[in-house]
Amino acid sequence: VYNGTRYLTEQLDSLRLQTVSPDRVLIADDCSTDESFDLIVKYIEEHGLGNWTINKNRSNFGWRKSFKLLLDLASIDDGIVFPCDQDDIWEPDKIAVMSSILEKDPSIEVLSCAVEPFYESGGKKVTVYGAVDDSKPLDDLETPVFDSKFMLVRRPGCSYAVKSSFIREIMPYWQDDFAHDGMLWRFSLLKGTLRLLNQPLIRFRRHDSNATEMRHIDKKSRVAEIGMCLRFSKVLQEYCSSNPGDYRISSAHIEHYGSVLNARLHLLVGGLKISDLGTILKYRKYELSNRSLLGDFKALISSCDSK
């Protein structure tokens, strides 16, 4: 939670009124400067929620590290963990439906439901991955394949239900600046234990202060982002090397993706070489979108203009 007083009560109500109550609810306040912490404390007291706890971070960790710490804590006991944002609204049967599917199928470690986006005043209209596919039944379960687009996270983290044993397994590979949805999506995709449910069980609020919408295209930010993606690809390779299973095809995808990232990094910090351009063209399908390389050129031109 961070400065969420505007939407918190709606989200808290949707958790409290689930048809299957959660065993416990863990909340971290990331040093909010509004009344978020006091609002939640009062809410817990008013509704007698003895299994709900809230703690305030000792400093502002940011949402990535905060989610990592909370998921680490939540996965101590065996069970199912539901990551939760501060501003969405859960359907009353979200826990019931997703828990039932996970408990019946041991091959699933991460289950993601569809989402129903809605926009507040000022909310920027963006592409929302994970909306209902009207061509499929609501109970359809898709098994995504680890391919050249493996880094593209197609569902938001607030739509996930995750077996705690899986969180414990991947926690040694988890760095503080890795987003929780990326960690959970990509590792379960790699293992073949990710499933996508077509049923919308969360109302996904979009507004002008969504953390996931705050993007920068300046050179420094793009270099940092590419560096983070390189580190992520390396930990995926480490997992492939350290765990049983046939990851030859997946490892090849990860290696090719790393080659493109290195070429993009050379473009931004040292100037593009012919060999780098060849790499980018050869493995172009590993770009998350056609805008990635264009954004690199824009950032490079912008940095040159500012000198």
Regions found by a protein language model. Name each.
Residues 147-151, 156, 171, 177-179, ...:
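C-terminal subregions of glycosyltransferases and related glycan-biosynthesis enzymes
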Residues 1-217, 301:
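Nucleotide-sugar donor-binding/catalytic module of glycosyltransferases
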